């Protein structure tokens, strides 16, 4: 496995629409290596999701996951943790009209975060890393991460989804001025 270079905001690959991966090619060693490298890169930079375009690969796939403190992956519906997943050619559909604003950051936009409105509950059709068709219902954090990473596949960055830029902030300022607001 290799740690890949992450494209930063301003690089054209982040604004391009990624190409679908033919299902017959998902198990190809090149795609499997890319998935492994995405996981390795995501962990190296302490991310919870990473899309192929973020590592200069214009393909419709991403990895995501959060490991529990005890090292075990948890159920996808848990609001604070999610298992490690690789999704290829995802199609996301909101399940309800409920939209919740939550804080997001991005490895391609280092040290900045903002409040982004997203559907709280979604349905996802995709292929897993073995090339099997899968359907997932996700809510809370997993739904937010899947929508964020799927946006990368369409050339959309998180601040494109922000209702306004009043909450766009550096991480240091977020910790200093915004974190206390979340806890009250």
Question: Which residues are covered by each model-predicted region?
Answer:
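Active-site rim/adjacent substrate-binding subdomains
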Residues: 1-147, 152-184
């Amino acid at each position: 496995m290799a740690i890949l270079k992450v494209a930063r905001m301003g690089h054209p690959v982040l604004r391009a629409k990624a190409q679908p991966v033919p299902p017959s090619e998902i198990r190809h060693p090149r795609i499997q290596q890319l998935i492994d490298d995405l996981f390795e890169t995501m962990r190296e930079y302490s991310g919870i999701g990473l899309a192929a375009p973020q590592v200069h690969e214009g393909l419709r796939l991403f990895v995501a996951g959060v490991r529990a403190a005890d090292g075990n992956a948890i159920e996808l519906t848990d609001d604070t943790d999610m298992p490690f997943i690789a999704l290829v050619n995802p199609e996301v559909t909101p399940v309800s009209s409920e939209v919740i604003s939550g804080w997001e950051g991005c490895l391609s936009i280092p040290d900045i975060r903002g409040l982004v409105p997203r559907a709280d509950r979604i349905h996802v059709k995709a292929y897993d890393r073995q090339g099997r068709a899968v359907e997932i219902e996700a809510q809370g954090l997993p739904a937010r991460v899947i929508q964020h990473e799927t946006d990368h596949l369409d050339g959309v960055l998180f601040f494109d989804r922000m209702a306004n830029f009043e909450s766009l902030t550096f991480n240091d300022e977020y910790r200093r001025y915004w974190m206390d607001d979340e806890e009250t």
